[in-house]
């Protein structure tokens, strides 16, 4: 079975010939997916108005990416775009803290399957169950496996960091954290301090919020 991790395409010199990893998908299609997803995010997910973020800070906008990750047109784009974002990383499963991470991970699972590849998904509960198997992580076992932690967006980094800790406690190796949008509110610095590689698809400038 083929897993998703691959090395980027290189020239004869061993240097990548493009910023976009070679996935077998035409680069024009990758760019089109990214551009269309950005259009939908701007149209459906960005809410202007005074709001209080999870960090306690006030902001003049809110990025509600559940309107995207649970949208019938956008969800497949999320899967493909996120998959391309981390194509050069070697991992076998993807997941994060419920609820924001769940549709992102599932979209990536389906995108991999559509490409004839294998990618498992898992869900990290906010607390372990008090009944049944009393497990905190749902889905295929991740012990001894390399995993990617995902989230739709992160304000403080708390949710991905909690998910990463839970995954490690379950015996997994966490290779990186990836989100759809970065709000530039301190999450990147928290991930760096924790020794986690961090990637995101869109920044504030691309979202028209800088």
PLM regions: where:
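Solvent-exposed alpha-helices and their adjacent loops that cap or buttress functional pockets
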Residues: 55, 139-143, 170, 190-191
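Short, glycine/charge-rich flexible loops or terminal/linker lids adjacent to PRPP-binding catalytic cores
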Residues: 105-148, 155-162
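Short acidic, glycine/proline-enriched helix-loop-strand junctions
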Residues: 88-89, 104-119, 189-206
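Short, well-ordered alpha-helices that flank and scaffold nucleotide-derived cofactor binding pockets
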Residues: 80, 84, 106, 110-114, ...
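Short helix-loop-beta connector
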Residues: 87-92, 142-144
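Short glycine-rich phosphate-binding loop at a beta-alpha junction
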Residues: 90-100, 176-178
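PRPP-dependent phosphoribosyltransferase catalytic core
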Residues: 2-12, 26-40, 165-210
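Active-site-facing substrate-recognition patch
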Residues: 8-13, 26-89
């Amino acid at each position: 079975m083929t897993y998703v991790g691959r090395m980027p395409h290189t020239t004869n010199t061993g240097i990548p010939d493009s910023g976009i990893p070679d996935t077998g998908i035409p680069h024009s299609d990758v760019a089109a997916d990214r551009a269309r997803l950005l259009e939908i995010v701007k149209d459906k997910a960005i809410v202007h108005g005074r709001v209080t973020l999870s960090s306690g800070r006030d902001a003049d906008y809110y990025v509600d990416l559940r309107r995207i990750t649970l949208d019938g047109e956008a969800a497949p784009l999320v899967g493909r775009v996120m998959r391309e974002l981390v194509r050069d990383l070697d991992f076998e499963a993807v997941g994060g803290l419920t609820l924001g991470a769940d549709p992102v991970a599932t979209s990536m699972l389906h995108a991999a399957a559509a490409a004839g590849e294998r990618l498992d998904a898992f869900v990290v509960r906010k607390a372990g169950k008090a009944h049944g198997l009393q497990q905190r992580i749902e889905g295929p076992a991740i012990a001894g496996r390399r995993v990617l932690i995902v989230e739709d967006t992160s304000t403080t980094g708390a949710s991905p960091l909690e998910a990463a800790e839970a995954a490690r406690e379950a015996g997994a190796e966490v290779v990186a954290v990836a989100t759809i949008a970065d709000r530039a509110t301190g999450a990147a610095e928290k991930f760096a301090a924790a020794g986690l590689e961090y990637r995101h698809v869109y920044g504030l400038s691309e979202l028209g919020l800088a």
